[in-house]
């Protein structure tokens, strides 16, 4: 399928928003008194996670999960599979799930449910991109970088069939007439 990628959110805007999210997260957790863990959902969140953890100014651990509901195309499936679980115990800790993009909410709802059973002190969600118009499951999201329209986006860690993760901006995929 022939397509092009148009810049939707430039790199400078992303960096500025992540700095602001870091300040908000720091403010929320600075007096918690508990250990904090940022849980990045791979693969898409890795760039966001790396930049965000440098902006969060409270001591924190970093861990990762891989949960998948996407195939190699442009649509989501309803099946959610945990492909890689956390390496560390989160019991009694403040846990912040870091996601690249929330679409239907199915994946995040399942991850939140699984992590909630592990008895964290608190459980919150931070996403770079949110598509509220696509939501099928109500998931509380405490920290949102950008709310975006229902466009297929790539870049800044987000892929299309494993391509475009390297882009320093978020772009929308525009299909071309063949």
UniProtKB/Swiss-Prot annotation:
Binding site for diphosphate: 43-44, 165
Matches recorded under InterPro entries: HGPRT (IPR050408), Hxn_phspho_trans (IPR005904), PRibTrfase_dom (IPR000836), PRTase-like (IPR029057)
Residues at the catalytic site: 103 (proton acceptor)
List of residues binding GMP: 99, 103-108, 131, 159
CDD domains per the UniProt record, alphabetical: PRTases_typeI
Cofactor: Mg(2+)
Gene3D superfamilies: 3.40.50.2020
Assembly: Homotetramer.
Protein name listed in UniProt: Hypoxanthine phosphoribosyltransferase
Organism: Salmonella typhimurium (strain LT2 / SGSC1412 / ATCC 700720)
Taxonomic lineage from the root: Bacteria, Pseudomonadati, Pseudomonadota, Gammaproteobacteria, Enterobacterales
